[in-house]
Amino acid sequence: GANLLKIHDGGYVPVMIATAFTVIMWTWRRGTAILMEKTRHTDIPLSSFVSSIERKSDHSPAHVPGTAIFLTSDPESAPAALLHNLKHNHVLHDKNVILTIRTINKPRVAQEDRYTVEKVSDRFSRVELRFGFMESQNVSQALATLRKTGLKFDIMSTSFYLGRRKLVPDAKSGMPHWQDRLYIALANAATDPSDYFRLPANRVVELGSHVII
């Protein structure tokens, strides 16, 4: 009873703030789950993609010098930016790196635990970089240490490919329309990956796609 009286004396303000934060967090988690579920239906396993693309045929893409790094959250699937680049530009770089960046539940990561490198084929490698939650995620600097593994490339002749999704609300998404709009607004307000990961601005290529959520 005493706590109810405090609501009339301004106690409703922290209650409203807490409710707003709860709605925002729940919307973000729910919207992200829906988005991942929808994109999963169109994903192509990376191993299958590499096998098909490296099979010699009259339709093989042209090869260009240099290294292409494709950022993705799912290292098991061919990144959307890679697929769009092939579709529109019909080229494949000499070296292609599928890069995943993880933030782990530690303040900092020891240098020997910073990365793992997996060779998928002569042209494709899969790399995972790990950062602690207190570290600045300087990807260009971290990639320079990969030379120890034999994965050598000149950062200034390397192109970073990012997939950018334009989200479109769907009445059948599983969330109310206002929540669709809130999720899209939150996604649009997120930090630009090229800035967050400190990628050289003149080496970044963004390829967009429409996704209905």
UniProtKB/Swiss-Prot annotation:
How does this protein sit in the membrane?
Multi-pass membrane protein
Q: Which reaction does it catalyse?
A: K(+)(in) + H(+)(in) = K(+)(out) + H(+)(out)
State the GO CC annotations: plasma membrane
Domain of life of the native organism: Bacteria
Supply the alphabetized keyword list. Answer: Cell inner membrane, Cell membrane, Ion transport, Membrane, Potassium, Potassium transport, Symport, Transmembrane, Transmembrane helix, Transport
GO MF annotation terms: potassium ion transmembrane transporter activity; symporter activity
Q: Where would you find the membrane-spanning parts of this chain?
A: 10-28
For the keyword Manganese, the answer is no
Claim: Cell inner membrane is one of the keywords in the record: yes
Q: Where in the cell is it found?
A: Cell inner membrane
InterPro entries documented for this protein: K+_transporter, K_trans_C, K_trans_N
Q: Where does this protein chiefly localize?
A: membrane
Q: What does this protein do?
A: Transport of potassium into the cell. Likely operates as a K(+):H(+) symporter.
- Which PANTHER family does the entry mention? LOW AFFINITY POTASSIUM TRANSPORT SYSTEM PROTEIN KUP, OSMOTIC STRESS POTASSIUM TRANSPORTER
Similarity annotation: Belongs to the HAK/KUP transporter (TC 2.A.72) family.
The protein depicted here goes by the name Probable potassium transport system protein Kup
| Species of provenance | Rhizobium tropici
What lineage is on file? Bacteria, Pseudomonadati, Pseudomonadota, Alphaproteobacteria, Hyphomicrobiales
